[in-house]
């Protein structure tokens, strides 16, 4: 996944000087960043539906996403630009992402929340093949 990300950065023409590629347990990483006092202007997350950590920790998006988003708010800068969540979890609706963002990021920052489905157009039928959902908070400024 990191190699694919590096390729995308390179293909976009961006030098990547300020891009960090991190493979870690996201909750542990965010908790360390809070302790270090590090801040971010934007957060993009694409959490898995389910997973297990190195020590048997269980990740379940339906149980853990709200907590993750809330602790991520603690590492947003004073003037964040955006917070994007992408998910392919079948049991999660875009309205859930919208509500989580409204009750977390938008409560702390002035902005707007939008959500929707991610899909691939089927050329022959002009239908959309649903592939996932997104929730986005963005600054009004």
Residue spans for each PLM region:
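S-adenosyl-L-methionine
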Residues: 1-44
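Short, structurally constrained coil/turn elements
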Residues: 13-15, 77, 109
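Mobile active-site "lid"/loop adjacent to the S-adenosyl-L-methionine
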Residues: 16, 23-24, 40-71
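Short glycine-dipeptide loop
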Residues: 71, 76-83
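C-terminal catalytic and target-recognition region of SAM-dependent MTase-like enzymes
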Residues: 80-141
